[in-house]
Amino acid sequence: MITIIARLPEIYSIFYPLINVLPAIPVFFFLLAFVWQASVGFR
């Protein structure tokens, strides 16, 4: 059990870039929807 707790920072460091990107995902989907509407012609 203690070894698992000791290894947590290593595991977390792998996912740290992913956690940095997470807040930008809704913005990305908003831009994707905007580009899709622009390509359709704002029907």
From Swiss-Prot:
Coiled coil start-end: none
DNA-binding as UniProt keyword: no
Subcellular location(s) of the protein: Plastid, Chloroplast thylakoid membrane
Major localization class: plastid
Keywords, comma-separated and alphabetical: Chloroplast, Membrane, Photosynthesis, Photosystem II, Plastid, Reaction center, Thylakoid, Transmembrane, Transmembrane helix
Propeptide part(s) removed at maturation, as residue ranges: 1-6
Cellular component per GO, a single term: photosystem II reaction center
Pfam families recorded: PsbK
Cited InterPro entries: PSII_PsbK, PSII_PsbK_sf
Transmembrane spans: 14-34
Keyword Aminoacyl-tRNA synthetase listed: no
Any one GO BP annotation for this protein: photosynthesis
Membrane topology summary: Single-pass membrane protein
Similarity field: Belongs to the PsbK family.
Function text: One of the components of the core complex of photosystem II (PSII). PSII is a light-driven water:plastoquinone oxidoreductase that uses light energy to abstract electrons from H(2)O, generating O(2) and a proton gradient subsequently used for ATP formation. It consists of a core antenna complex that captures photons, and an electron transfer chain that converts photonic excitation into a charge separation.
PANTHER family: PHOTOSYSTEM II REACTION CENTER PROTEIN K, PTHR35325
Oligomer and partners: PSII is composed of 1 copy each of membrane proteins PsbA, PsbB, PsbC, PsbD, PsbE, PsbF, PsbH, PsbI, PsbJ, PsbK, PsbL, PsbM, PsbT, PsbY, PsbZ, Psb30/Ycf12, at least 3 peripheral proteins of the oxygen-evolving complex and a large number of cofactors. It forms dimeric complexes.
Designated name of the protein: Photosystem II reaction center protein K
